[in-house]
Amino acid sequence: CPMLNAGYTVAEVIYDTTLEKMEKSIVKYLEEFDPDCGLGTGTNYAGEGPMLELERPKNMRWAGMPGDVIDVNSIQQFIEYPTLLDDEFDEFFRDRTGWSLFKQAPRNSDFLVPLLKTLQGGRVSARSVAAQVSTPEFKAMLEDLWRLNELNQEYRKNAARLNKTVYEMGYPVFRQGGAAVPFDSYSDGLRGTILSLQDLYDHTEEVERYIEESIGPMLEMIRMQGKMPGAKGKHVFMALHKGIDGFMGDEHYRKYYWKHLQMIIEEIIKADMVPYIFCEGRYNTRLDCLTEVTPGKVFYHFEEVNMEVAKSKLKDIACIAGSFNTNLLQFGKPEQVRDEAKRLLDICAPGGGFIFMTGSGLSHVKKENVVAMFDTVREYGKY
């Protein structure tokens, strides 16, 4: 973890709104290990602590938050629960905006509750609105919104400075945007893992309707990303949450997951960008599906897969990476790290189409093991 390597706690970096601690952490990492590409603020919420406190999410815990709920060096933790209840499907599809405002938003955060009170039913007049927006709660919410905007503007300015520093050091940052499979959005944001699986049997029509209504806007969002300055050739990142082996059978996977993931991948390609597909969890049974894309255009990053099989199936179709278990970097010895790195290189390097990457982030790992990994790839991985 670059932050820990630089001597900072995760909490310190999350609450440093200048992003100077994050920048120093990244610069130290790049100077010490010289990887092939740079890093940005990533997904560790660097500099976002004060904004998170204002937003008050109910489904998230982060290092340094009031009450010290989790360890100062823990990555963020998410609490999954349904925001769309069993008896709300009709309301959800009839008026998604209203449902999102009055049902989902308060379940995710209390931040906008004063605003929601002003929007609920009854006769509207200038005087009634004036009374509602003059309450202490509403005024406090407005002040929080203004402060949140100030913090966000500062964050964006500092993030741009950080990226500029990385570029000037000679390291490209490839990521341009993001996308999501509709079923993942349904499961992650509305129903939760267990209920979304049950819904494949108990609420089949509702799942299908949500997916079909969501795929169009997702494809349009990708087209808009492709029109942004400098987008050509950049990565559009997608983390696949619910496509893992065993979560759903092959028939369900193809119908509710792969069909729309495939559409998104091809739309990213049409937009002259690169689909960066991070396959979370074990992905051995999904490899045949992953071959059904335009050859030479897709990058698959695996958390856990049989790389021999992945290489044999995808070698002429996509670039592959990952499946180096970071537990080895945390608990193993340098010699074990070197042996595993060599094994992966022997399997995946022949013929190209392989980028050496770990299966997940470098969190709480031994520095000597990271050094052993980088040295082995440089020495043993030469073509």
Regions found by a protein language model. Name each.
Residues 1-383:
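Catalytic cores of TIM-barrel enzymes
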